[in-house]
Amino acid sequence: MTPRSLWGSGSGLDQRLLDLTAADDRPWDSRLLRWDILGSLGHIEGLRASGLLSARDHARLRQGLRRALVAAEQGAVALRPEDEDVHTAVEQWLTRRLPGLGERLHTGRSRNDQIACDLRLYLKDRLLTLQADALDLVDALLVFARAHQKVLWPGYTHQRRAMPSSVGLWAGAYAEGLLDTIESLPELWTRVDRSPLGSAAGYGVPLPLRREAAAQALGFAGLDRNVATVQGGRGKLEAAVLFWCTQLGHELARLAQDVILYSAEEFGYLTLPHELATGSSIMPHKRNPDLFELTRGRAAALDGDLSSVLQLKSKLSSGYHRDFQLLKEPLMRGIDRTESMLASMGAAVPQLTVNRERCAAGLGSGALATDEVMRRVEKGSAFRVAYREVADTLGRGEAVAPPSASRIVARRRSTGGLGDLGLTAAAARSRAARRWNGQERGRFERAMARLAGRGPRGGRRGR
């Protein structure tokens, strides 16, 4: 028996066409099931406010959709092999239980604005979860930095020892680097937090839709006002989200690379606990940093997810194209990668051990050369003269007298330096970002709870 679609006259589809257009998409489409039902609950609020749905029909549809939501959470609603997409699965489930009335659900709506709405609800949920996970890692790094702020080790330029640094400065730098990306989410959020409903296929509908009512019911801050921009922006929004993820990914990849390098026997600054290292099937002494290597690799793969989206959207004319369906996989896969990296690194950082003796030994005479130059400058030498004198000393193979660790720190009291890491200010930034996250999570969950007819879930969600 050939499946039937929501479009056309209801004639059967060739199974080969369905396989080509839908089979690979179902695993990704299935993730939108909850959001499709909630989006439909918001849509019928707009229909009721527009006078396109009677109070009685609205109440029955709302009850049916709420039952669908419960059934979906219990696994009783799912995409079947004969369903073309998540929208088909939900509408046909509803229509089987509310014959005639279920067929009113799609009034004033296209699958084009429907999927755009589903994706934005999905993105709001996932972005808030990713930001919270990133803040957990920031806080772990700040705790690590505070615990080791006076442990000196060499700082590197060109992968060569350069000047004194500290474990605290290193960890604090990664915390602030992550915060820079975390704090950019509110700007991206303004683009996600706009309702596309009512734009239909991209040109609106000849009905008196009150688009604002559906947007308000779904907790969106506003509308994508121009109906054509909803489809024109497909791929653009996904790319913006993945770019935000790649910025987190790049920071995590650099952090992972440092841990891999500094935990190698040749450095020995950091030690991985047994719980974070794997072994070899042939070499019994090995403790491999697989977690960090795979974080580095996933960050590279995340770049590929962004590239896929950019390539898919870059050469299309205005209006809707079926190519847009292929945006879901790299988007969701990229978000999955980001979540996995944040979770693993957040768990790993507190378990790293610092070898103070190896760190101190790593400084060496070369890394202290600039300190000697500045010591002579403070005594009255011109900088360039002092620079040449120290260079000549080192060139003859002679070492410069090393200052004490306390002296090294004491001479670096400028804001953000070894003697003043600014960890309190970074922690304040983290708390501010958490407050924003909590406010937006609360607003989002309250809107979803009202639609579902239940109390807000609270906490984090995902997938």
Residues of each region from the PLM?
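Charged, flexible cofactor/metal-binding loops and thiol motifs
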Residues: 119-120, 124, 131-132, 146, ...
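A helix-coil-helix interface module used to build multimeric assemblies
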Residues: 1-204, 209-216, 278-279, 292-294, ...
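Charged/polar positions within long, soluble alpha-helices
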Residues: 45, 49, 70-77, 95, ...
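A general structural motif at alpha-helix termini
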Residues: 61-65, 218, 263, 274-276, ...
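Short, well-ordered beta-strand elements within core beta-sheets of diverse protein domains
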Residues: 43-53, 169, 239-247, 371-379
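Glycine-rich cofactor/substrate-binding loops
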Residues: 1-39, 97-101, 283-463
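Residue-level detector of short coil/turn "hinge" positions at structural boundaries
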Residues: 54-55, 222, 383, 400
